Amino acid sequence: MDRVAKAREIIEKAKAENRPLVEPEAKEILKLYGIPVPEFKVARNEEEAVKFSGEIGYPVVMKIVSPQIIHKSDAGGVKINIKNDEEAREAFRTIMQNARNYKPDADLWGVIIYRMLPLGREVIVGMIRDPQFGPAVMFGLGGIFVEILKDVSFRVAPITKEDALEMIREIKAYPILAGARGEKPVNIEALADIIVKVGELALELPEIKEIDINPIFAYEDSAIAVDARMIL
């Protein structure tokens, strides 16, 4: 089965259940398109939370998985730097309890678990559909750069590798990525690759109205999508 058919299966299931895509589903779709994501598992109970955390390897991150909870931090649904089985058990309990308190009627699927990654340079890649031009892909540096300074670049899909490299060089904060002031430069090629693939995804899956991959951690040798949200 090709990537479009596999992604459609995930999308159709969510549509049939009249709910948004949850983080593990969004990451599964990114994986189908060759966009790197951390290895993850979804634990439905305490035992699985401990087992999967051990398999993935401490320290890990745990986040609530629920179609009704979009802003996980607001719900107290995120725990980072979990170092052992005891902490994993405790984190699972706390997250589930917090989520119940936050939204008593929410459907709680459990938690997504992935390895705590070393801090990279945070960047964002997004996609919106313009009524006139079709799918437009956005690139910017994470945190205040996008939210406050609105330092972003856009291109309409399809996007070539050259377009993607231009998008990256266009933002005012580019020197930070290029290794200004003795900082280590990040892998621009790996970022360009993600931008191109988001463009392909947008063209092949018109059911997805919006994509927000935030943050992507960019390193010297690679780039990895840490969190992802897709709107149908």
Curated annotation (Swiss-Prot):
ATP binds at residues 53-64. The keyword Secreted does not apply. Its EC number is 6.2.1.13. Its main location: cytoplasm. GO terms for cellular component: cytoplasm. Optimum temperature is above 90 degrees Celsius. It is found in: Cytoplasm. Optimum pH is 9.0 (at 80 degrees Celsius). Optimum pH is 7.0 (at 55 degrees Celsius). It holds the Pfam family ATP-grasp_5. Heterotetramer of two alpha and two beta subunits. Catalyzes the reversible formation of acetate and ATP from acetyl-CoA by using ADP and phosphate. Can use other substrates such as isobutyryl-CoA, propionyl-CoA and butyryl-CoA, but not indoleacetyl-CoA, phenylacetyl-CoA or succinyl-CoA. Seems to be involved primarily in the conversion of acetyl-CoA to acetate. Participates in the degradation of branched-chain amino acids via branched-chain-acyl-CoA esters. This is Acetate--CoA ligase [ADP-forming] I subunit beta.
